[in-house]
Amino acid sequence: MRLLGLDPGLRITGWGVIEVTGNRIGHVADGVVRSDDRLSLAARLAQLHGGIVAVLKAYEPVEAAVEETFVNRNPASTLKLGQARGAVMLAPALAGLVVAEYQPSVVKKAVVGTGGAAKDQVGMMIRTLLPGATLETADAADALAIAICHAHYRAGALSLALARAGGGR
């Protein structure tokens, strides 16, 4: 099963695709979609959306996951990030994919083991878990981490559902 992780940003949106087979996770592809800061906000959002649509067509994931937005000190920046996140999430949603959302601390804990991990720790762990991943940027590493987090949580939810269905009340 292919899963897409997305790390939204207005300037750079990271994406990563993994293949999950049983309890094995493999790297498929990763990269970034960049928007041109000389363009209007609407045009930049369209660039991000179009880039993610292209990723969906190229790699055909069956589910997607995205990091939740944190609120920073600058309300205008937070608003723009939220708009970018919406444009990015819209692409898999319109393609009929489930789009899961995870807090940054949950993603870090799932991949590194601690919710307060630094970006370089996340990148190092991604390189360990996914040998051969090129990791164009930290944004791509974060996107792969989000996909891995979703794979872990999805597997846990599936195990719980199977246990309940089997009479494990």
From Swiss-Prot:
The protein's Enzyme Commission number: 3.1.21.10
Annotated signal peptide: none
InterPro entries associated with the record: RNaseH-like_sf, RNaseH_sf, X-over_junc_endoDNase_Mg_BS, X-over_junc_endoDNase_RuvC
Active site: D7, E67, D139
Cystine pairs: none
Gene Ontology biological process: DNA recombination; DNA repair
Source taxon at top rank: Bacteria
UniProt subcellular location: Cytoplasm
Subunit structure comment from the entry: Homodimer which binds Holliday junction (HJ) DNA. The HJ becomes 2-fold symmetrical on binding to RuvC with unstacked arms; it has a different conformation from HJ DNA in complex with RuvA. In the full resolvosome a probable DNA-RuvA(4)-RuvB(12)-RuvC(2) complex forms which resolves the HJ.
Family: Belongs to the RuvC family.
This protein's name: Crossover junction endodeoxyribonuclease RuvC
Originating species: Rhodospirillum rubrum (strain ATCC 11170 / ATH 1.1.1 / DSM 467 / LMG 4362 / NCIMB 8255 / S1)
